[in-house]
Curated annotation (Swiss-Prot):
Originating organism: Archaeoglobus fulgidus (strain ATCC 49558 / DSM 4304 / JCM 9628 / NBRC 100126 / VC-16)
NCBIfam families named in the record: cas_Csa5
Stated name of the protein: Uncharacterized protein AF_1870
Top-rank lineage group of the source organism: Archaea
Entry-linked InterPro entries: CRISPR-assoc_Cas5
Length: 116
């Protein structure tokens, strides 16, 4: 796994979605994704949903709103590119599992999720 890539920003994206939507859907999808193309697709969907939430006038979870302000979208783009360049399935699994685990840890701090 790339030692310079932390995937913190993608984890923040997913954590905000867990906190705001009360659903682990994207974390679960990413944790079991079989290919890099599908991983990028799921992350694109997550980013689209995050953008939609950002358009709302009020976040339901104030901590999630604060975390959105800490997302570095240039880093998000680099993290996505790193995943898209991953050729080995084992390495992809390591990266997506790391993102999912970090997202769960962050969402716990935000008080999100419904226990699905």
């Amino acid at each position: 796994m790339s030692s310079t890539m932390s995937f913190d920003n993608l984890a923040k994206v997913l954590a905000v979605l867990v906190a705001e939507q009360g659903s682990y859907t994207y974390v679960d999808k990413l944790g079991y994704v079989p290919s890099k193309d599908l991983a990028v697709f799921y992350l694109k969907e997550a980013l689209r949903d995050l953008h939609s939430i950002q358009q709302k006038e009020k976040f339901e979870n104030e901590k999630a709103r604060e975390l959105v302000g800490k997302i570095d979208y240039e880093r998000v783009e680099k993290e996505l590119e790193d995943i898209a360049k991953t050729d080995e399935r084992k390495e992809l699994r390591e990266k997506t599992s790391l993102i999912a685990a970090k997202a769960l840890a962050l969402s716990a701090k935000l008080g999100g999720g419904s226990g699905e």
